[in-house]
């Protein structure tokens, strides 16, 4: 199994998917590769590569070459990795308007994706070195979480997810102690 080093999102994703299926990291032979290199090794049919952990846009390359391998599961099946932005407590205390601006900008970007998808895909594609068309194709496998979805998540799902994630990270040795769950998120900026 090819994956990124311990503590990274691909490592966590692999550990999460394995745990949800009664397995652990100890049940697979692992090789540390970046998500892009892992996808490339899978596509190339590299000897000894039976599985790889990767993400978009590299997952799209695997999807485009089904003879090289089958996508078993994604974060659409196991929603445990999300793009977030975070600020230190000191920054939030000193700059609440800036933090609110970050949150508002995210939701404005979602509005732009709906109102001007082509322009949005061009901007986002340029950031990850993809054409607008390629980004549009790969973003179909993402979930854009609007304000209501964020509010729902932080109203209850976040606490349960954080507990499960902490238990898993403890079990695989990434963390030595569970964090104070009450200090993991400050959802006031999404209200």
What are the residue ranges of the model-derived segments?
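Pocket-lining segment of extracytoplasmic ligand-binding domains
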Residues: 37-127
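Residue-level signal for threonine
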Residues: 88, 146, 186, 190
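Residue-level detector of family-conserved "landmark" positions at structurally sensitive sites
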Residues: 28, 135, 179-180
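Secondary-structure end/capping motifs
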Residues: 93-174
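Short coil/loop linkers at secondary-structure junctions
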Residues: 19, 24-26, 129-131, 175-176
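Bilobed "Venus flytrap"/periplasmic-binding protein-like clamshell domains
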Residues: 1-63, 118, 159-160
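Residues that form or immediately flank small-molecule/cofactor binding pockets and catalytic motifs
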Residues: 35, 76-77, 186-189
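Conserved C-terminal helix/tail region of periplasmic/extracytoplasmic solute-binding proteins
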Residues: 163-191
């Amino acid at each position: 199994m090819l994956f990124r080093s311990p503590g990274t999102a691909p490592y966590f994703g692999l550990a999460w998917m394995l745990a949800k299926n009664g397995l652990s990291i100890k049940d697979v032979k692992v090789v540390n590769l970046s998500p892009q290199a892992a996808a490339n090794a899978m596509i190339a049919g590299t000897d000894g590569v039976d599985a790889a952990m990767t993400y978009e846009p590299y997952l799209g390359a695997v999807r485009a070459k089904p003879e090289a391998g089958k996508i078993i599961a994604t974060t659409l099946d196991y929603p445990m990795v999300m793009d977030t932005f975070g600020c230190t407590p000191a920054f939030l205390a000193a700059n609440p308007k800036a933090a609110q601006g970050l949150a508002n900008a995210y939701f404005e970007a979602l509005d732009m994706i709906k109102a001007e998808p082509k322009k949005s895909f061009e901007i986002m594609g340029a950031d990850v070195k993809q054409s607008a068309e390629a980004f549009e194709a790969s973003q179909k496998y993402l979930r854009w979480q609007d304000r209501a979805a964020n509010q729902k998540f932080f109203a209850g799902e976040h606490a349960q997810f954080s507990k499960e994630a902490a238990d898993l990270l403890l079990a695989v040795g990434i963390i030595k102690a569970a964090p104070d769950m009450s200090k993991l998120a400050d959802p006031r900026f999404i209200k």
